[in-house]
């Protein structure tokens, strides 16, 4: 049973309503509050986003909405710098990486407490890591795809995938040592993910983190319903609170309705601007902010379906799809066609990519010589949602399905509401669907942010079992930064394109529209904006 199935939306919201040689040191500190007597912020701010979180614990959930809520309430040892994405001090003031790159010693910030009054100390850090380790070792299906499992390669039932996590030691109240079995190059960047933010040990013991977050962040949870999550500024926050006293994250699945809500003043901003809304917003002089492409949309090919065990069939799928037309007509301007799963910003584009270009006749020829015999293939796609990698999935499905049908595929459309467990359905190991529309949004600045969740294990999102490919992905993650690592990722991208575990479609741009109240919106390519950094007029 997946996490979403184990703890449904109705239960979550009911419960949430109840609880209100190398040595590197962190530098550049986030400011602490000028004084506890400073008046708390009074402004209210309402952001409309596309879906409700099915739970609040980012260590279990991978949705953008869960991360958006948790980023306001919880904090990690390190945070991503807004300008560079590089790790910067947060709950850890500084750190030192051992010469063999197999341990990091963190010095923790003093005088920080959780929202429930519990002291933040080394024991609290260990309690969180112990919880994450136990989750990754759980037999639950969702555990294979939680961030701790994919980052540390931990808990896989496959003996070919070995963990790089060795444990956390408490040296003293303000010092913890994170130990690895082997080097993991992007470790500090990976720890900036919302999934590695600290919850109160009391909430961990109570097992309530998925219903009521208790962290050290600038906001605390006030209430949650299927329509809205409300957060209040935490007056005893150790850092800068900013100008927002009440933050509401309102669920509005339809992009046109989100746009209308902004134009009528019901909300102050909304995420994931729909394709048809850019012109109306421009006519009204509404500011639209664009994120850099840091996601990939793809057409999933279920390898457990017999037809897709044939490489010719998989290549026929790619040749049938006009990915250039998709990127141009169904995504915002600035979206790039994807020939690989890793975005261009890392400069690891393969030198010999094998994804076929749009060629319907070639697709027909491949099908004719393949093992496919016209059997109907179930095509699962989400509806009533927008994602950073798939803003209008119904329209994407319509175009792709028409192109596949024209070259000879027989399809059975299977639409499914996102909030009714779509992500579970496409991630189920024994699912009987053949095609699925999905994607992945990068959560930290490294190619492994894409490779690990998609391809590091047979239980990864693409569900592709290739021992050599898995070994190469996991080896590249530990290589020191430099030309050799860059070359390894280029080779990996070439190899993935040859095997075609799925069809990469695009690296989409996503956009946020903001009202005239907003002076400075803390836009992030990952979507993990911190609203205490928001500046209002």
Each model region followed by its residue ranges:
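Gly/Pro-rich hinge or "lid" segments in bacterial periplasmic/extracellular proteins
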Residues: 182-242, 246
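A bilobed periplasmic-binding-protein/Venus flytrap-type ligand-binding module shared by bacterial periplasmic
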Residues: 232-236, 291-316, 320, 329, ...
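Append "and occasionally in soluble cytosolic enzymes with long acidic Gly/Pro-rich linkers
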Residues: 309-402, 406, 491
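Ligand-site clamp/hinge motif
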Residues: 207, 227, 235-280, 293
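Detector for C-terminal structural segments
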Residues: 12-19, 24, 321-348, 392-399, ...
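Surface-exposed binding/hinge segments that line
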Residues: 107, 141-201
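N-terminal lobe/hinge region of extracytoplasmic solute-binding protein
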Residues: 48-99, 130, 214
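Aromatic- and charge-enriched surface segment that lines or borders ligand/interaction sites
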Residues: 93-144, 177, 307
């Amino acid at each position: 049973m997946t996490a979403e199935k184990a703890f449904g939306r109705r239960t979550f919201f009911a419960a949430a309503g109840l609880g209100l040689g190398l040595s590197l040191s962190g530098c550049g500190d986030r400011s602490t509050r000028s004084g506890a007597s400073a008046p708390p912020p009074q402004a209210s701010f309402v952001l409309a986003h596309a879906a409700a979180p099915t739970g609040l614990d980012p260590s279990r959930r991978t949705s953008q909405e869960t991360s958006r809520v948790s980023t306001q309430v919880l904090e990690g040892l390190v945070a991503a710098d807004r300008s560079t994405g590089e790790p910067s001090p947060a709950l850890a003031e500084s750190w030192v990486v051992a010469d063999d790159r197999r341990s990091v010693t963190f010095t923790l910030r003093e005088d920080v407490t959780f929202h429930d009054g519990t002291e933040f100390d080394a024991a609290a850090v260990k309690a969180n890591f112990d919880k994450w380790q136990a989750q990754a070792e759980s037999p639950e299906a969702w555990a294979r795809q939680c961030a701790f499992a994919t980052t540390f390669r931990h808990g896989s039932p496959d003996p070919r995938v070995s963990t790089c996590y060795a444990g956390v030691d408490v040296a003293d109240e303000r010092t913890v040592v994170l130990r690895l079995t082997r080097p993991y190059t992007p470790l500090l960047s990976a720890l900036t993910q919302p999934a590695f933010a600290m919850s109160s040990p009391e909430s961990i013991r109570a097992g309530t983190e998925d219903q009521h977050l208790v962290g050290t962040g600038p906001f605390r949870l006030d209430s949650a319903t299927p329509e809205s999550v409300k957060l209040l500024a935490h007056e005893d926050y150790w850092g800068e609170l900013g100008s927002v006293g009440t933050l509401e994250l309102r669920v509005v699945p339809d992009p046109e309705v989100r746009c209308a809500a902004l134009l009528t003043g019901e909300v102050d901003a909304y995420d994931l601007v729909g394709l048809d809304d850019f012109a109306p917003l421009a006519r009204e002089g509404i500011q639209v902010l664009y994120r850099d492409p840091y996601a990939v949309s793809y057409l999933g090919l279920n390898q457990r379906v017999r037809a897709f065990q044939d490489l010719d069939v998989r290549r026929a799928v790619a040749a049938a799809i006009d990915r250039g037309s998709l990127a141009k007509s169904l995504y915002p301007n600035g979206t790039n066609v994807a020939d690989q799963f890793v975005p261009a910003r890392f400069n690891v584009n393969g030198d010999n990519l094998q994804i076929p270009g749009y060629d319907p006749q070639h697709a027909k020829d491949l099908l004719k010589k393949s093992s496919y015999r016209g059997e109907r293939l179930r095509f699962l796609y989400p509806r009533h949602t927008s994602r950073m990698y798939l803003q209008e999935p119904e329209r994407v499905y319509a175009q792709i399905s028409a192109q596949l049908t024209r070259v000879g595929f027989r399809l059975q459309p299977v639409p499914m509401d996102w909030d009714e467990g779509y992500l579970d359905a496409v991630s189920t190991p024994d699912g009987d669907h053949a095609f699925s529309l999905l994607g992945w949004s990068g959560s930290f600045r490294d190619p492994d942010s894409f490779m690990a969740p998609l391809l590091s294990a047979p239980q990864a999102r693409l569900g592709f079992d290739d021992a050599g490919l898995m070994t190469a992905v996991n080896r590249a993650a530990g290589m020191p930064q430099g030309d050799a690592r860059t070359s390894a990722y280029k080779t990996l991208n070439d190899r993935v394109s040859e095997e075609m575990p799925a069809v990469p479609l695009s690296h989409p741009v996503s956009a946020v529209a903001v009202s005239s109240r907003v002076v400075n919106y803390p836009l992030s390519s990952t979507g993990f904006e911190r609203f205490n950094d928001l500046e209002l007029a």
